[in-house]
A protein has these predicted regions:
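Short, glycine-/small- and polar/acidic-enriched structural segments
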Residues: 1-59, 84-88, 103-107
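Secondary-structure end/capping motifs
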Residues: 121-198
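Conserved C-terminal helix/tail region of periplasmic/extracytoplasmic solute-binding proteins
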Residues: 190-218
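Short glycine-centered helix-capping/turn motifs at secondary-structure transition points
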Residues: 2, 81, 100, 192-193
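A local structural motif
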Residues: 54-69, 73, 80-83, 193-201
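Pocket-lining segment of extracytoplasmic ligand-binding domains
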Residues: 66-152
Length: 218
């Protein structure tokens, strides 16, 4: 409560990966044992790093660093050789590929969509109708839109960027974020004690907005 509602008629999936310098001794996921990996605290990069590394390392060997800032700051730290490994997504993911950094492990992940508890449901649906149209345009001709990544980046990198090499990034999936997704995700997070003090008591029905679509979904 107080953190918004889960929009249950869509979710998104983002390409993501753990990157290291091209000359790093880290070449396999197993080489990441006890190596600090820069991630965002209680974010997609946090969860996806654990999820992707679990088949390769014990929990005691997974070393997450939360002290390296937000997405672009973490990217800068890797470029400046201030950190050994970073989990990156969106534009920074493609920029690392362009610059020749080594992707050690794919950590692509699914994201729920949160909206304000005060938001009008009709306004939310109009917003997502526009997003659906935009997603279709990107699916059809992504090369027409990758130049917009440049606007997100720190000024120091813009002249280096070749956005013709970039991919579509996060993709919105217009399918229900189901009760199964909700329950499985909560159970996974709870098992790993990621949230101190627990996850709260809200049920799926209490947490979501846009129930009309779900009622018509078998």
């Amino acid at each position: 409560s107080g953190h918004g509602k889960l929009y249950a008629n869509a979710y998104s999936v983002s390409p993501c990966g753990i990157f290291v310098p091209h000359d790093s001794d880290i070449k396999t996921p197993e080489d990441l044992a006890n190596v600090p990996i820069s991630v965002g605290y209680q974010s997609g990069s946090h969860y996806s790093t654990i999820q992707a590394l679990e088949p390769f390392l014990s929990h005691n060997e997974i070393n997450l660093s939360f002290a390296d800032g937000l997405l672009f700051k973490r990217m800068e730290n890797l470029i400046d050789s201030a950190v050994p490994a970073v989990n990156l997504f969106s534009g920074p993911y493609y920029f690392m590929e362009q610059l020749g950094f080594r992707k050690v492990l794919d950590t692509s992940f699914m994201m729920a969509v949160m909206v304000s508890e005060e938001a009008d449901v009709e306004d939310i649906e109009k917003y997502f109708k526009a997003l659906r149209m935009a997603q279709k345009d990107i699916d059809l001709r992504q090369e027409l839109y990758t130049h917009y990544y440049r606007d997100e980046f720190p000024e120091r990198f813009r002249d280096q960027m070749d956005t013709r090499l970039f991919g579509p990034g996060e993709r919105i999936v217009f399918e229900p974020y189901s009760r199964e997704f909700f329950d499985d995700s909560r159970a996974w997070i709870a098992e790993r004690n990621i949230f101190e003090g627990g996850l709260g008591e809200l049920t799926y029905d209490e947490a979501i907005v846009a129930p009309k679509m779900l009622e018509s979904t078998p």
